[in-house]
UniProtKB/Swiss-Prot annotation:
Catalyzes the conversion of oxaloacetate (OAA) to phosphoenolpyruvate (PEP), the rate-limiting step in the metabolic pathway that produces glucose from lactate and other precursors derived from the citric acid cycle. Its EC number is 4.1.1.32. Its cofactor is Mn(2+). Monomer. InterPro entries: PEP_carboxykin_GTP_CS (IPR018091), PEP_carboxykinase_C (IPR013035), PEP_carboxykinase_GTP (IPR008209), PEP_carboxykinase_GTP_C (IPR035077), PEP_carboxykinase_GTP_N (IPR035078), PEP_carboxykinase_N (IPR008210). The keyword NAD does not apply. Pathway: Carbohydrate biosynthesis; gluconeogenesis. The gene is pckG. NCBIfam families: PRK04210.1. It comes from Acetivibrio thermocellus (strain ATCC 27405 / DSM 1237 / JCM 9322 / NBRC 103400 / NCIMB 10682 / NRRL B-4536 / VPI 7372). It catalyses: oxaloacetate + GTP = phosphoenolpyruvate + GDP + CO2. This is Phosphoenolpyruvate carboxykinase [GTP]. Keywords: Cytoplasm, Decarboxylase, Gluconeogenesis, GTP-binding, Lyase, Manganese, Metal-binding, Nucleotide-binding. It is found in: Cytoplasm. GO terms for cellular component: cytosol.
């Protein structure tokens, strides 16, 4: 489509013109989001060898992509928060002066789209027209980005109609950083070398510039860049929350519904929890979102959440009919797979899919693979991009423009000791304290000499806060003052990953986590037995329904205990963590820590 048919928004038209003059694409194409457009772009990529169609009998409407081996994940050390002052970026973000960064990037962007098309993608984060939604426009030279954005967000003409002539949008500029000379064709996946990759955010201007990567969160700018980094700044300024959280709906046997959000660092089973199949009779979990929640107070003083996305961008390896059957059903059709293995009959395969490796595969790098190869057939960060509407347990109100009222916020991480299976905060501020100290023990999976140490990840937002982490934690504290305390969600810290002294899991996890959710639902409804401990309210040993579960009473006691010695060590570790955030850390959090230490010292278990 041409621009004049699509929009009369002067700010948008001027910006597209200015960016095109800098990037010099061969042509500009405005995306309308139609099926016909999608098929045309897919065909373009199949013809160029970038996309492999999968077997239509096994995976209808599905395609496999292989990226360059240097372009396989988010690049945190090339991700910048270019606020006007370094102080605003804070101690946990990479900062470059915005004037300097723009000058550097303008040099890179000059002529970077030669030989390519500039695609204009108008997109809505959240249902089009929702009072909680926001509009962005991404300019990209990657058709791969267009077909993924079409799944992950709502794109096209309807978004421009909503934007109108003077609506506001977040400008997102993206280039793979690989201009083509006349007559030159791509040899595989286009991207720039690591030192030329920049994923840059200008928070005051609400602008995103990304260069040099075609992959995932670096290139699909609606996801982490907008929905978390820029949106977190908007949320701070406008009095709401943009969070790295799943959203689910739990229905009890009587038909009562409770809505819950949950923040977990990577590799803690967020998507699995969002699509949980409960093992306790009569209970049902349905998905509203698996990754991001935008939350605002409603007229009734309760916190309402929407999922700003329209799809799932999930890690494929480890996803199986055992770990997440609902995800497996979601990705049966109309799904884009990236960096997983291809079977000889045109299906996908990855480690942890639950079936034996076939005798022969084409691996994620396009090479022949056999079980004797000694390498992984799929990249550990191999992905699927699938429409949320295909999830068999998508909740009926997942696109409700008003959002859903949140009764409980879960936080968690992977901790083999110290943190119990579940405990509830005393109040909102104590819950924010728990969120500020959460994290996972560093495992051998991360290349690090810190194995056994805890990587603290406040509210699982460490890589995604668009401003100073201390101001972010203060913003959470401030949110608690904006409504009647009785209307605030209750905050629960869960840990599915406890081990005994022999390194054996104490809790079976997966669907059995519904037993913990049941207690949480009982607690928010004024029921559910609990005992007050130094760290918060803990279920009594008989409060968790263990009917039909092979977990001994001793193990349950271990899972629901406060180990004074381990917790006093934890306090020392938190002190070091807090010191690393510097002088600006909210005084309330230091006060919470001191109070915890005092309660522990007086505790006799």
């Amino acid at each position: 489509m041409t621009s004049t048919n699509m929009t009369k928004n002067k700010k948008l038209l001027d910006w597209v013109k200015e960016m095109a003059e800098m990037c010099q694409p061969d042509e500009i194409y405005w995306c309308d989001g139609s099926e016909e457009e999608n098929e045309r772009l897919i065909k373009l990529m199949v013809d160029s060898g970038l996309a492999t169609p999968l077997n239509p009998e096994k995976r209808p409407g599905c395609y496999l992509f292989r990226s360059d081996p240097s372009d396989v994940a988010r690049v945190e050390d090339r991700t910048f928060i270019a606020s006007k002052t370094k102080e605003d970026a804070g101690p946990t973000n990479n900062w470059i002066d915005p004037v300097e960064l723009k000058a550097t990037m303008k040099e890179l962007y000059k002529g970077c789209m030669k030989g390519r098309t500039m695609y204009v993608i108008p997109f809505s984060m959240g249902p089009i027209g929702s009072p909680i939604s926001k509009i962005g426009v991404e300019l990209t030279d990657s058709p791969y980005v267009v077909v993924n954005m079409r799944i992950m967000t709502r794109i096209g003409k309807a978004v421009l109609d909503q934007l109108g002539e003077d609506g506001d949008f977040v400008p997102c500029l993206h280039s793979v950083g690989a201009p083509l000379k006349e007559g030159e064709k791509d040899k595989g996946w286009p991207c720039a070398p690591i030192e030329k990759k920049y994923i840059s955010h200008f928070p005051e201007e609400r602008t995103i510039w990304s260069y040099g990567s075609g992959y995932g969160g670096n290139a699909l700018l609606g996801k982490k860049c907008f929905a978390l980094r820029i949106a977190s700044v908007m949320a701070r300024d406008e009095g709401w929350l943009a969070e790295h959280m799943l959203i689910l709906r739990i229905t009890d046997p009587e038909g009562n519904k409770t809505y819950v959000t949950g923040a977990f660092p990577s590799a803690c089973g967020k998507t699995n929890l969002a699509m949980l199949i409960p093992t306790i009779p009569g209970w049902k979990v349905e998905t509203i979102g698996d990754d991001i929640a935008w939350m605002r107070f409603g007229k009734d003083g309760r916190l309402y959440a929407i999922n700003p996305e329209a799809g799932f961008f999930g890690v494929a390896p480890g996803t199986s009919m055992d770990s997440n059957p609902n995800a497996m059903h979601t990705i049966k059709k109309n799904t884009i797979f990236t960096n997983v293995a291809l079977t000889d009959d045109g299906d996908v395969w990855w480690e942890g899919i639950g079936t034996e490796p076939p005798a022969h595969l084409i691996d994620w790098q396009g090479k022949d693979w056999t079980p004797d190869s000694g390498t992984l057939a799929a990249h550990p960060n191999g992905r699927f991009t699938a429409p949320a509407s295909q999830c068999p347990v998508i909740a009926p109100e997942w696109e409700d423009p008003e959002g859903v009222p949140i009764s409980a916020i879960l936080i968690g991480g992977r901790r083999p000791n110290t943190i119990p299976l579940v405990h509830e905060s005393f109040d909102w501020n104590h819950g924010v304290f728990m969120g500020s100290i959460m994290g996972s023990e560093i495992t051998a999976a991360a290349i690090s000499n810190k194995i056994g140490q805890v990587r603290r990840d406040p509210f699982a937002m460490l890589p995604f806060i668009g401003y100073n982490v201390n101001d972010y934690l203060q913003h959470w504290l401030n949110m608690g003052t904006k409504t009647d305390p009785s209307k605030l969600p209750k905050i629960f810290y869960v840990n599915w990953f406890r081990k005994d002294s022999n390194g054996k899991w104490l809790w079976p996890g997966y669907g059995e986590n519904s037993r913990v959710l049941k207690w949480i639902v009982e607690r928010v409804n004024g029921k559910g037995k609990a005992v007050k401990t130094p760290i918060g309210y803990m279920p009594t040993v008989d409060a968790i329904d263990t009917t039909g579960l092979d977990v001994s009473k001793e193990d349950m006691e271990e899972l629901l205990s406060v180990n004074k010695e381990q917790w006093l060590q934890e306090v020392e570790s938190i002190k070091e963590h807090y010191k690393s955030y510097g002088e600006k850390l909210p005084k309330e959090l230091w006060a919470q820590l001191e109070a915890l230490e005092q309660r522990l010292k007086e505790y006799n278990g």
